[in-house]
């Protein structure tokens, strides 16, 4: 029952929705919030608000360096990007398993 106690311990952390991760990956891939919004069918404003909540409320870490319309990932953002890609890949596998 070690797994149950581990899950209970981890449940105190905030959760991150897969749609937020998908948006985060789109920003990294597209290099900006507007193009990422087009990819995930959201407005630039909605994408911006999602990422602000992720940075400030959930992770309490800066994920992006913003230079005008250009966006680059911080070192913390690079780490999250690797995890996000893996999580989304696993999520897709789970949903496609019969």
Feature map (PLM): residue ranges:
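Short, Lys/Arg-enriched N-terminal segment that forms or immediately precedes the first helix
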Residues: 1-12
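Short alpha-helical elements of helix-turn-helix
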Residues: 10-30, 78-81, 85
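Short helix-boundary/capping micro-motifs
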Residues: 25-41
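Alpha-helical residues within the helix-turn-helix
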Residues: 38-39, 56, 78
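A short LG(V/I)-centered, amphipathic sequence patch enriched
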Residues: 55-73
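Residues in the recognition helix of alpha-helical DNA-binding motifs
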Residues: 50
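Alpha-helical linker/hinge and terminal dimerization helices associated
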Residues: 57-58, 80-98
């Amino acid at each position: 029952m070690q797994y149950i106690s581990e899950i209970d311990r981890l449940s105190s952390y905030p959760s991150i929705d897969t749609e937020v991760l998908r948006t985060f990956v789109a920003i990294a891939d597209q290099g900006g919030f507007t193009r990422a919004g087009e990819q995930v069918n959201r407005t630039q404003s909605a994408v911006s608000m999602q990422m602000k909540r992720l940075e400030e409320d959930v992770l309490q870490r800066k994920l992006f360096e913003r230079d005008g319309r250009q966006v680059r990932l911080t070192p913390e953002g690079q780490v999250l990007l690797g995890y996000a890609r893996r999580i989304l890949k696993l999520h897709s596998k789970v949903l496609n398993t019969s």
